[in-house]
Every structure is written in structure tokens, then in C-alpha cells.
Amino acid sequence: MEITFFGTGAALPTKERNTQAIALNLDPYSNSIWLFDAGEGTQHQILHHSIKLGKINHIFITHMHGDHIYGLPGLLTSRSFQGGENKPLTIVGPRGIKNYVETTLQASLSRLNYPVTFIEIDDQLHYHHEGFTVSAYNLNHGVPSFGYRIEAPTTSGKIDVASLREIGMEPGPKYQEVKNSDSFIFNDKVYQSSDFKGEEKVGPKIAIFGDTMPCENELKLADNADLLVHEATYIDGDRSLADSHHHSHINDVLHLLEATNSKQALLNHISNRYNLSDIDVIYAELQNQYPNLKFKFVRDFDTFEI
């Protein structure tokens, strides 16, 4: 799996950062791409990447602030002409996302040539698709704002070809039965499939947060995650400014990373008060403060394997 950041700034687009948009490539589990938020200019950012709009089959919106949704109407209409025709799309988000999309399309006299399903969240959500589990919990941002926990499916262990050949089974269609069942019959004898394949591989767990100040539901979302994607709007000074705007201070995020035993954090939604050189200096200081934690401030178009 890969995660790509098409927008890493907060509130307003700048020359260095676009507003929020994150793409999650589900390969090798699925041929799909999921998009998290679609700030202004998202479709233009995607033009600079190999991702095609037609492959996006889910869009998850964290909350209804403009820097997270202003790019959605244009992206939806462009999808009609960029490989999305007749390909269903599911949009998940806070209550109001359906009205926002339908109103903007109606006002601009736009029509989509593919079906759209809306799932609106009031408090929490547990959603299953193609073996993935998505859990959403309300955060604390002054408006309904959600974080999403994505759990990839567990995959079967690799077939032990040498062991199967020892019992006389050569590679062929029968191997799929060994891979996908608990037991199989070969030459009138019953075998346990687990004796002929490696251990199951648990899929990665990813938590993608909307804007928030610290709250209890963050712990549920981040628990033992392989990756946290979290806002870092305020990365220096005291936390009073972060609190007054219902955002997190960088120390809150790193404490969350540590408390939940998560493996690493990618930090985005960075205020335009910080330029790139400011961030480099602050990052070096934070690495000295938290030497045992793995974290990184991301930039537009950064891609990471999960």
C-alpha cells in the first residue's frame, strides 16, 4: 500500500502547500484508490501524479471546513471524463456532505455519468469493503470532525511449494484450494492447509485524523496503528493558541504516538505561518526531544509505502 499527499497545508493554499487531500492506494489488496479530503485544487494536484480519477472509488471527508471540501465538486465532474464513467463512487463524511455535493452540482448545472452513494456519519461508523474495515469516530474541533481507522485484510501465508511437492502435488489449480481452505484432500488423504503455508500476514492499520484537539476517541483510532496521519497546525510555542482554535499542538500528537504504541506519524495540515526552513529547524529540535519516536513533516506529493 502507498499513501500520497496532494495537499499538506492548513486553511489556505500557498505557493508551497495545497490544502488537504490524501490518496491511499490499496494495492496489493485491491485495485482501488481511496481519497481522504479534497481541498481546493485537489484535481489539479492529481494531474501531476500517475493516479487517475477513475480509480478513486471512495472519498472520505473528515469535516465540512472549506480547506477539506472545496475541491470536491470539480473533482467529481472531472471524474466523469477521466475514466469514471459508470464506475460507482462512495462518499463518506459528516452529515451535510450529501447536501453540499448535490447543491453545488445543481447550481452549476452539472451531471455525473456514474452512480454516487453517500454515507453520512452522525457519531461513529463501522464500514466494510473488499476485506477492509473502516472505523470512524467523532473528534473535537468545534464542528463535527472525524478520524478514520483503516484496517487492511489479513492475507494467507505463502504456499510452501517444496512441502507440497513432497506429497506429490505439483503447482496447479489445487494450490488455490490449499491457500484458501483449512484442509484439503489429495490422493484420498486429508491434509491441514496450515502445514503447507507460512503464517498469515495481518494487514496494516492506518489512522487518518481530521482536525482536532486532543480527545478520547483519538486513542481508539490510533491504538497500535502502523501509521498515524495527523494534523500539525501548531508546531511551536505554547498550546493555548492550538486550544483556542480546537487544533492539536505538535506535542499532543507525539504524546499520542507514544501512548498508543503506534509505529510512526506523518504530520500534515501545517500552518502557513511556518516556511520550509522553519519546519526543518523545529523538526531537528523535536527529534532531540523525542529520540525514540518515528515521525516526519510531509510535503505536497510525498509518497510513502505502508
From Swiss-Prot:
Zn(2+) 1 binds at H63, H65, H141, D211. InterPro entries: Metallo-B-lactamas (IPR001279), RibonucZ/Hydroxyglut_hydro (IPR036866), RNase_Z/BN (IPR013471). GO terms for molecular function: 3'-tRNA processing endoribonuclease activity; zinc ion binding. The active site is at D67. Its cofactor is Zn(2+). Its EC number is 3.1.26.11. Zn(2+) 2 binds at D67, H68, D211, H269. Keywords: Endonuclease, Hydrolase, Metal-binding, Nuclease, tRNA processing, Zinc. NCBIfam families: PRK00055.1-3, RNase_Z. Homodimer. Zinc phosphodiesterase, which displays some tRNA 3'-processing endonuclease activity. Probably involved in tRNA maturation, by removing a 3'-trailer from precursor tRNA. This is Ribonuclease Z. It comes from Staphylococcus carnosus (strain TM300).
